[in-house]
Amino acid sequence: MNKMLRYLSDYKRESVLAPLFKMLEATFDLFVPLVMADIVNVGIAAHDFHYILVRCGILLLLAIVGLTCSLTAQYFSAKAAVGYSTGLRHALFEHIQTLSFSEMDTMGTSTLITRMTSDVNQVQSGLNLFLRLFLRSPFVVFGAMIMAFTVNFRAALIFVVAIPLLSIVVFGVMVITRPLYKSVQTRLDRVLGLTRENLTGVRVVRAFDKEKSEVDRFEDANELLTKMQLHVGHISALMNPLTYVIINLAIVALLYVGSIEINIGGMASGDVIALVNYMNQILVELVKLANLIVQVSKALACAGRVQAVLDTKPGMEFPAQLTGNVPAEKAGDAVRFDHVSLTYKGAGAPSLSDISFTARRGQTIGVIGGTGSGKSSLISLIPRFYDATEGSVEIMGRPVRQYPRADLRSKVAVVMQKAQLFGGTIRSNLLWGSQNASDADLWAALETAQAAEFVKAKPLGLDEPVEQGGRNLSGGQKQRLTIARALVGKPDILILDDSASALDYATDAALRKALAALPGDLTVFIVSQRAASLQHADQIIVLDDGRMVGLGRHAELLESCPVYKEIYESQFKKGDAQK
């Protein structure tokens, strides 16, 4: 947990001043009962209106100064807490960007979002409360007891008995409810996870008429949360009546002892009022202290979860610079797999087994296979989204692990299955491919991706707004824009991971023709469910259950590969393939 304190290093001054100003406020509060006692003992007893007025002025001054100190402390604590959470959130987001797909798969997107949002916010709230109360509350408790002894020693002995009893009740309730609050947080995370999952997949829910089952599933989780919250609430609700019973008994004892002391001349009636006020101050601060401990406990639990993400080391290390030379015999290679196998973390069986092939520069490589055959797993090894568990993957004659991250990303462009665009404009999305691209480069990429026509039809052209996720574009338009984005960077290797599935056959064919006509030695990997889309590829890799069962051209595979022949003929008979 000490590691997380470094994000508070820029706010040391605020972290010191906030509790100091709260202690100043508490100091002024401790003098209020004494001034009130003076008003009763001297002003009211002597019917001295001027004395009462002066003491009321002192009370007003104490209130104003105390309020000023409180606001100042609040400013410094809020500044420190907000600054801390900003730095923590930035560090967390930056660290997440370094994680490989393996770590992302293990933790899950929804978990990381929770860590970035609610957990960091909880840490911020806990820190803000801690800076304001961790010194003030103990200071007031002990200060009020000391001040009570200055008023009357015998009466103050009641405080010695009452404070431990109050502490037992307050902290006893806190100890019991603390683990229960953790259970509440766990169940709340479950409810939030279900909500996020439902809202993310709302179209699928509606398509399958699953609204009722989703409501039932949410209701079950919400009911468990409600029961736990009620259980904790019932226990927490015991705090106020129990503490007030102790306080009232203590006040009765104070009044009894005070009346005796007044009769024998040991103290005045105003002193009894002061002692009662000190007792109330102690009660308030003990309750605040208990709430502080509960909130800090929640914050520490959240901080632990955030720290767990920060402690997660990236599974991949990229070198700082490219070293070594490419052997002459590999100068023409674009991609080479040498007995490559891949087993995902936590998976029982390998997703890829003993894959070997070589793709030459300028070739078009098709990848086909049934659902779950390992197509996406295979192409994810080329840009090193995952590391092969066995064998080696080479890019342009070098092992992929020798490439710095930036060099590898500039050489390999990937268009994912799900077309993902970001809020902004068409231009800003295309510039992800290369920040230095000119308008001519953007239009050239759009022409190749068969997207220029619909972009030109937009009122603002390249500056047409794009909503988050590309909600204002059709599926085919989004896919073509993501292909254009990949082409803007002019990569050596382009991977299309079933990224033309929303295109009609004519557009798909035009895209493949345009890619083949590009100058240079662009190597293209096309993952597709359509055998017709791969007929003209230089090589077609056929996968079945993670194994390569065929490698060759279309005509060769029809003769030698039963799996490919079955795929092709099943589509041809349905009229979905072209000769």
Predicted segment positions?
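A short amphipathic helical element positioned immediately N-terminal to and/or at the very start
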Residues: 1-10, 112
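Transmembrane helix-loop-helix hairpins at lipid-water interfaces of multipass membrane proteins
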Residues: 9, 15-72, 76, 149-154, ...
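An intracellular "coupling" helix at the cytosolic face of ABC transporter transmembrane type-1 domains
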Residues: 10-13, 98-102, 118-127, 131, ...
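Hydrophobic alpha-helical transmembrane segments of ABC transporter permease domains
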Residues: 20, 24, 28-32, 57, ...
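Short intracellular "coupling" helices and adjacent cytoplasmic loop segments at the cytosolic face
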Residues: 46-47, 82, 90-114, 118-120, ...
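Helix-loop-helix
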Residues: 47-54, 147-161, 231-305, 309-310
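ABC-type nucleotide-binding domain
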Residues: 326-579
